[in-house]
Swiss-Prot record:
It is an enzyme of class 2 (transferase). Pathway: Cofactor biosynthesis; thiamine diphosphate biosynthesis; 4-methyl-5-(2-phosphoethyl)-thiazole from 5-(2-hydroxyethyl)-4-methylthiazole: step 1/1. Keywords: ATP-binding, Kinase, Magnesium, Metal-binding, Nucleotide-binding, Thiamine biosynthesis, Transferase. This is Hydroxyethylthiazole kinase. HAMAP family: Thz_kinase. Substrate binds at residues 45, 194. ATP binds at residues 121, 167.
């Protein structure tokens, strides 16, 4: 997998304008929609159980995010996910805060048991808790612990039969056989709420147009990281408010040439 291949997926997303159905959380809905629009995808936020199955069936990808968890949303996620599976629509799952409470952890384990996932994305603590591996967590943003991130990612990919994505200072993408580390991004991303949730939806846009889900995820993470670096270079001294606005600009303006120039990936043995 080389940078030229990866950069082509960015162009394909913009040419295809994929419909991404998001069942996401109330904190990030606006930011997610704007980020997808800036990228060149078409977001839809449909949550009602009466319509989610139909909407999911016509989407390019379905993104399930359990950030602000309620029983009615879990029901909607299951309906949408099963419809997506029947209609060969890739499903992405963001198990926000898995491990923080018993209910949240129960849901985070139930969804992959019921729905076939194209990819799961979270920090190390979240992914570890989904597969019942011990990892310290405090709140929904915890991502540090004492385990091996690559090992956890590979185990999750194998157990859940999916592409596992663990994000942090370095990002890991694996299907259990191919494992790629992405070293793009900027620390200021952690100062803006919703950047992780938006990333999962961006991966959804890439998965909608590239059926090699490992390549799609690597392309999405590299693109997202480079866009954040370009935005930070212009705004980091001003603060996270200015960064957030410029980041949306860079999601629209970052090119395949930028990816080839600034992308940093490594395939592990």
């Amino acid at each position: 997998m080389n940078m030229k291949e990866i950069s082509k997926v960015v162009d394909l997303v913009r040419e295809s304008n994929p419909l991404v159905h998001n069942i996401t959380n109330v904190v990030v809905t606006n930011f997610t929609a704007n980020g997808l629009l800036a990228l060149g995808a078409s977001p839809v936020m449909a949550y009602a159980k009466e319509e989610v199955a139909e909407m999911a069936s016509i989407a390019g990808a379905l993104v399930l995010n359990m950030g602000t968890l309620r029983p009615e949303e879990v029901e909607a996620m299951l309906l949408a996910g099963k419809s997506a599976n029947v209609n060969n629509v890739p499903v992405l799952f963001d198990p926000v805060g898995a491990g923080a409470t018993s209910y949240r952890t129960e849901v985070a384990r139930h969804i992959p048991a019921e729905i076939e996932l194209a990819s799961i994305r979270g920090n190390a603590a979240e992914i570890a808790n989904v597969i019942n591996e011990r990892w310290e967590i405090k709140g929904v943003d915890a991502g540090t612990g004492n385990g091996n991130v690559v090992s956890i990612a590979r185990q999750a990919a194998d157990e859940l039969n999916t592409v596992a994505v663990i994000t942090g200072k370095e990002d890991v993408v694996t299907d259990g056989e191919r494992t790629i580390v992405i070293r793009n991004g900027h620390p200021i991303l952690t100062k803006v709420t919703g950047t992780g949730c938006l990333l999962t939806s961006v991966i959804g846009a890439f998965v909608a147009v590239e059926k090699d889900y490992v390549k799609a995820a690597v392309a999405a993470l590299t693109f997202y990281g480079v866009a954040s670096e370009l935005a930070a270079a212009k705004t980091v001294e001003k603060g996270p408010g200015s960064f957030q606005i410029e980041f949306l600009n860079q999601l629209a303006n970052t090119t395949s040439s930028d990816i080839e120039k600034y992308g940093k990936i490594e395939e592990l043995e």
